């Protein structure tokens, strides 16, 4: 499965590792993904991967 949030569609970002000598190498900033079970309208449940921020939003608004 892709490293993307199923709700917001956010994916990993790219950036740099910066050493003390200011040498830069490329790196990826990954999401804090969590696997949760979501109840659908027809009564079934489904596992999806969502970011921790979206999980907070779901808990706040439900």
From Swiss-Prot:
Name this protein carries in UniProt: Large ribosomal subunit protein bL28
This protein's encoding gene: rpmB
Keyword Ribonucleoprotein (UniProt): yes
UniProt-listed GO biological process terms: translation
Similarity annotation: Belongs to the bacterial ribosomal protein bL28 family.
GO terms for MF: structural constituent of ribosome
Pfam families from the UniProt entry: Ribosomal_L28
Disulfide bonds: none
SUPFAM superfamilies: L28p-like (SSF143800)
Keyword tags: Ribonucleoprotein, Ribosomal protein
KW Ribonucleoprotein (keyword) present: yes
The organism's place on the tree of life at top rank: Bacteria
Lineage: Bacteria, Pseudomonadati, Campylobacterota, Epsilonproteobacteria, Campylobacterales
Region named Disordered: 1-22
Gene Ontology CC annotations of this record: ribonucleoprotein complex; ribosome
